Design a protein with these regions (language model features):
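Short helix-loop-beta connector
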Residues: 44-50, 122-123
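Rossmann-like adenosine-cofactor binding region
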Residues: 85-151, 155
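NAD(P)-binding Rossmann-fold cofactor-contacting core
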Residues: 69-87
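Residues in the short beta-alpha loop(s) of Rossmann-like NAD(P)-binding domains
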Residues: 57, 81, 133
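Active-site capping/gating segments
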Residues: 37, 149-171
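Phosphate/diphosphate ligand-binding glycine-rich loop within oxidoreductases
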Residues: 1-41, 146
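Short, well-ordered alpha-helices that flank and scaffold nucleotide-derived cofactor binding pockets
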Residues: 37, 41, 65, 69, ...
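Glycine-rich adenosine-cofactor-binding loop
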Residues: 29-32, 39, 48-68, 72
Length: 172
């Protein structure tokens, strides 16, 4: 891209690219806005909370930036190979308040998969799964059975698409 929005510059992840009238490319990130609407729809307060982000791709960067901006107390990214990984997840069982799944685990057609088992988490208030197909992943289903608030990724998808459409119309 020839020009990047301030969001992209701070997050480091682009998901919307528009070719401008002069032929240059403009990059933006609409997932931040979409994720904010997901939090809003759930009525979730993140300030001071202990947040686990599952996955280390572009979506996780966006979620981390949002959580930092909203004042989350501790933000831990869980990846397959990092310092915080699925093999030592139990060290977060007593602390985590919010889990955000940014991995594809549980997405159609692998609906029998989940990135983790929620049973050990004692202070969990909410599970946000960016997956929207199926509407209720195995992770969401388990959270509901434990009485934990949940939301899938459909709100994020719809809201980021609205913003992307607006950006396309404004920039072209």
């Amino acid at each position: 891209c020839d020009d990047l929005s301030h969001r992209v510059q701070s997050i480091g992840s682009v998901n919307t690219i528009v070719r401008l009238g002069d032929g240059s490319l403009y990059g933006d990130n609409t997932d931040y806005y979409g994720f904010s609407k997901m939090i809003e729809a759930l009525g979730l307060e993140v300030k001071g909370k202990y947040v686990l982000i599952l996955g280390s791709g572009g979506a996780s960067l966006t979620v981390k930036a949002y959580m930092e901006d909203m004042g989350a107390g501790t933000i831990v990214t869980i990846s397959r190979r990092g310092q915080d990984n699925y093999d030592n997840l139990d060290k977060h069982h007593e602390k985590a308040n919010i889990i955000v799944n940014t991995t594809p685990l549980g997405m159609y057609p692998h609906v029998d998969k989940a990135p983790l088992d929620l049973a050990g988490f004692k202070r969990l208030e909410a599970v946000l799964d960016l997956i929207y197909n199926p509407e209720e992943t195995k992770l969401i289903s388990q959270a509901k059975s434990l009485g934990i608030r949940t939301i899938n990724g459909m709100t994020m998808l719809e809201e980021q698409a609205r913003l992307a459409s607006f950006i396309f119309k404004q920039k072209i």
